[in-house]
Amino acid sequence: IAKLNELRSFGGAIRTRGLDDATVERFAREDRDLAVAIDAAHVLFTQLKNEMPDLLKLDEAGQIARVQADYVNFYAADAINPYVALAARGPWIVTLKGSVIYDVGGYGMLGLGHTPQAVLDALARPQAMANIMTPNLAQLRFANAIKQEIGHTRGDSPYSHLLCLNSGSEA
């Protein structure tokens, strides 16, 4: 909690409160991912104190505005999360203001949560950086894995082909 309090006390109003400290302490004892997320957030915060001290001093709404100032966001203002995510592991997000959020949804998470080690390990291997225009063995492996899962309770996949897109706002 001391690490979170350092983030919380740096300056600027907090909009997103997250879980109360007693709940955070209880879950941190039960789920190592939460403790790892808090430690990672503290390390990143320490780095940001030198790199972006003015950002850290802003109110949470000001931080959001500054972080996304140079981007077109296709979502309505009330659909944008009211915090800046600093670190995350499993279902846990630690915000730039030191709040802890439980988040099990979101684009691309595939039920694996934030920063899943299996995905990081796969991405850390050398890969041909190509899209569908360049045939690649990763495409075959992906198709085989998907076809094994989709329709497995009925004996075969109901789809003849796969179509891969980015998330809706990017497609």
Short names for language-model regions:
Residues A2-A77:
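Short, compositionally biased leader-like segments
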Residues N5-D31, Y71-F74, W92, V100-A171:
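Glycine-rich loop-to-alpha-helix module at the N-terminal edge of alpha/beta enzyme cores
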Residues I80-R89:
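Short loop/turn motifs at secondary-structure junctions and domain boundaries
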